[in-house]
Amino acid sequence: LKFVVLICLVIMASTSAQQCGDETCGAGTCCAVFSQNHCRRLSRMYDLCSDHADASPSGNYLFFCPCEPGLHCDRNTWTCTEGSSRSE
């Protein structure tokens, strides 16, 4: 039974992680591309951000991570805000 639990934990950890250059990004982070790839935390309220739709095919973002859950990236200011994800 302990072996089964261990296998489940390994599978859960591997599905929530993202390879980012030589690093593996965990939950609450993304792979942001500068001159090299770096794991960064998801953007918070008023932080600069990338839109979820702007991810590369490999799942990387240019410069900034998307916003953490409950926020959206305002395409006018490129900052995380609350409310509707539509630009007005």
From Swiss-Prot:
Disulfide bonds listed in the record: C20-C31, C25-C39, C30-C65, C49-C73, C67-C80
Annotated tissue distribution: Expressed by the venom gland.
Region forming the signal peptide: 1-17
Keywords: Disulfide bond, Pyrrolidone carboxylic acid, Secreted, Signal
Pro-peptide region(s): 86-88
GO CC terms: extracellular region
Main location: secreted
PTM-bearing positions, type Pyrrolidone carboxylic acid: Q18
KW Disulfide bond (keyword) present: yes
Cell compartment(s), UniProt: Secreted
Entry's family note: Belongs to the MIT-like AcTx family.
Protein name: U1-hexatoxin-Iw1d
Source organism: Illawarra wisharti
